[in-house]
């Protein structure tokens, strides 16, 4: 099984935002940017507007677990950044999974065009 790697540097996040492809729904925004052989990396951005620290950390843990669980579905050598919107604050694991795959489908559709 492949290792889960997180984006850490601000410059990595900025590159994904500036040059990546994005798709969104009411709950999530997903950015995807091909990197040069650095492997599959994930970043999570959750604003303080979403809720208190407990809520933000719960959403981050849910998304991190979803990415880890479905690691093989994500493209190799790409950076992915999930931005959680304010409406996500009351969502549970299965709802977030549904929203994640909805955004993933929109992103793949957009890349094909």
Curated annotation (Swiss-Prot):
Q: Which GO terms describe its molecular function?
A: 3'-tRNA processing endoribonuclease activity; ribonuclease P activity; tRNA binding
- Going by the record, the broad EC class of this enzyme is hydrolase
Gene3D superfamilies registered for this protein in UniProt: 3.30.230.10
Q: Name one GO biological process term.
A: tRNA 5'-leader removal
**E.C. number:** 3.1.26.5
Which keywords belong to this entry? Endonuclease, Hydrolase, Nuclease, RNA-binding, tRNA processing
Pfam family example for this protein?
Ribonuclease_P
Q: Which GO terms describe its cellular component?
A: ribonuclease P complex
What reaction gets catalysed by this protein?
Answer: Endonucleolytic cleavage of RNA, removing 5'-extranucleotides from tRNA precursor
Question: What family is this?
Answer: Belongs to the RnpA family.
Q: Please describe the quaternary structure of this protein.
A: Consists of a catalytic RNA component (M1 or rnpB) and a protein subunit.
Entry-linked NCBIfam families: rnpA
Q: What is this protein called?
A: Ribonuclease P protein component
Taxonomic lineage of the native organism: Bacteria, Bacillati, Bacillota, Clostridia, Eubacteriales
């Amino acid at each position: 099984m492949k290792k889960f790697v997180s984006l850490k540097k601000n410059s990595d996040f900025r590159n994904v935002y500036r040059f990546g492809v994005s798709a969104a729904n009411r709950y999530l925004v997903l950015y995807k940017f091909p990197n040069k052989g650095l492997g599959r990396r994930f970043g999570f951005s959750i604003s303080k507007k979403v809720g208190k620290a407990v809520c933000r950390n719960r959403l981050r843990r849910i998304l991190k677990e979803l990415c880890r669980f479905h690691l093989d579905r994500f493209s190799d050598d790409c950076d992915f950044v999930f931005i959680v919107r304010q409406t996500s604050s009351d969502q549970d694991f299965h709802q977030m999974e549904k929203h994640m795959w909805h955004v993933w489908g929109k992103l793949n559709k957009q890349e094909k065009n």
